[in-house]
Amino acid sequence: MLVVGMSHRSAPVALLERLSMDDSVRGQTTSALVERPSLSEALIVSTCNRLEVYTVTSSFHTGVNDVVEVLHEISGVDIETLRGYLYVRYADAAAEHMLVVASGLDSMVVGEQQIIGQVRTAYQQATEAGTVGPALHALAQTALHTGKRVHTETDIDEAGASMVSFAIDRALTQMGIDPASDKPLAGKTALVLGAGAMSSLAATHLGREGVDKLIMANRTRERAERLASHSLEAGVPAEVVDFADRASVLDRVDMVVSATGADDFTVKPADIPAGVQLMLVDLSMPRDIDDACAEVPGVDLVNIERLHRAKREDPTGAAAEGADALAIVREELEAFTSEQRIRDVVPAVSALRKRANELLLDELDRLQARTPDISQEDWKEVTRTVRRVMDKFLHEPTVRVKKLAARSGSVSYESALQELFGLEAVQTTAPPAITSVNASDLPDAGIVAIVNSPSTTGQSVSVDGS
């Protein structure tokens, strides 16, 4: 298992913007990934705050390099730039990362619920595209189950925090309004551009904050009308304007929230009437609103980049909020990795039984050739007896090897033999040879930065293979 990605923690927004993928590009990219001989499965999580490629690879070095090359080919970002900002997690560390992400623990707003839906969508799309196999099926389902447990069994999202609420609270603060006050948007009108998930969340949150009126605009007018009807049902007055006429209402609103993912800017400086006091909130990646709008007198702007900056300056509460959630992640990760280790040992057990059966048949053929006068009844009894001995001899190690595989860490060859065959420990006077070492005794090698550095011992090595 391998994950190669970048997020708000590792990369500037401008670079995340260049790597942002819509559904079409994401499908194209996963297909390109599994065409590489080293990669057998692929799933991509692409949001405004992260781009992560989850894969199953037959070779760590080759797999990482193949992922980086595909990202370069799809995005046009040069490989050296990618190397400077991408992070890599491998094996159990990769599995843990998806569980942490799906639980909202790696989000800019810790505990936000949108990410679990985004992981689910990524999984569904990759499944439909045929780029997900047994390993990623098991991992994605475990991650979604873990995320659900975190949100139902802890208080991590008690405050209902999300990227949308964080952005609007930030906008209110910049407007000189206390977000914690009762109905802080009372007497205000807001324009919502777009009618997707983010826009719907924004409209709902604006309604809860007491906005007097919402104006909706979307390229497909019917979707804007549907969103407006939901607002009306919630008791918030709403109207719809054609998307092409959105600039005509800017002198009537106090706030604009844009989440369209459009190719062109939805709001430009030339669209803004002179003398207005206007708060612009851009929730899109790539960005919807031209940064130059913030230079217009009376206009302020909140966007993903500015939210990142604000969160870095005030990262409060993350550790306390995530303690209980991390305990759930650890529990689910242990169960997942145990199941994977058991699954991985099954082919070896099958091969052992197959080989034992082949040897048994060979020996029976040899015995039959050497005892031609043995009666048919006696031969059947010999065959049954030999097969019973083989089955009894293999039964215990077959059961025990699965239990042994389920444990984390490693054991010595001597201990493995004793465990598999139920043997009593043999006391020796000579010091035992060192045949294994626990991963916990080594430096943490589950996380690798993609840099041109010397090779390291363990799970991780430098990307350039030096």
From Swiss-Prot:
Q: What is its EC number?
A: 1.2.1.70
**Which parts of the sequence are marked as the site Important for activity?**
H97
Q: Name one Pfam family in it.
A: GlutR_N
| Chain positions recorded as NADP(+) binding sites | G194, A195, G196, A197, M198, S199
Q: How does it assemble?
A: Homodimer.
Q: Which reaction does it catalyse?
A: (S)-4-amino-5-oxopentanoate + tRNA(Glu) + NADP(+) = L-glutamyl-tRNA(Glu) + NADPH + H(+)
Q: Name one GO biological process term.
A: protoporphyrinogen IX biosynthetic process from glutamate
Domain topic, free-text comment:
Possesses an unusual extended V-shaped dimeric structure with each monomer consisting of three distinct domains arranged along a curved 'spinal' alpha-helix. The N-terminal catalytic domain specifically recognizes the glutamate moiety of the substrate. The second domain is the NADPH-binding domain, and the third C-terminal domain is responsible for dimerization.
Keywords in alphabetical order: NADP, Oxidoreductase, Porphyrin biosynthesis
Enzyme class at the top of the EC tree: oxidoreductase
Q: Which residues form the active site?
A: C48 (nucleophile)
Q: What else is known?
A: During catalysis, the active site Cys acts as a nucleophile attacking the alpha-carbonyl group of tRNA-bound glutamate with the formation of a thioester intermediate between enzyme and glutamate, and the concomitant release of tRNA(Glu). The thioester intermediate is finally reduced by direct hydride transfer from NADPH, to form the product GSA.
Its encoding gene is what?
A: hemA
The scientific name of the source species is Corynebacterium efficiens (strain DSM 44549 / YS-314 / AJ 12310 / JCM 11189 / NBRC 100395)
Per the similarity annotation, which family is this?
Belongs to the glutamyl-tRNA reductase family.
Which of this chain's residues are annotated to bind substrate? T47, C48, N49, R50, S107, E112, Q113, Q114, Q118
Functional pathway: Porphyrin-containing compound metabolism; protoporphyrin-IX biosynthesis; 5-aminolevulinate from L-glutamyl-tRNA(Glu): step 1/2
Q: Which CDD domains match?
A: NAD_bind_Glutamyl_tRNA_reduct
Q: Which InterPro entries match?
A: 4pyrrol_synth_GluRdtase, 4pyrrol_synth_GluRdtase_dimer, 4pyrrol_synth_GluRdtase_N, GluRdtase_CS, GluRdtase_dimer_dom_sf, GluRdtase_N_sf, NAD(P)-bd_dom_sf, Shikm_DH/Glu-tRNA_Rdtase
Name of the protein this chain belongs to: Glutamyl-tRNA reductase
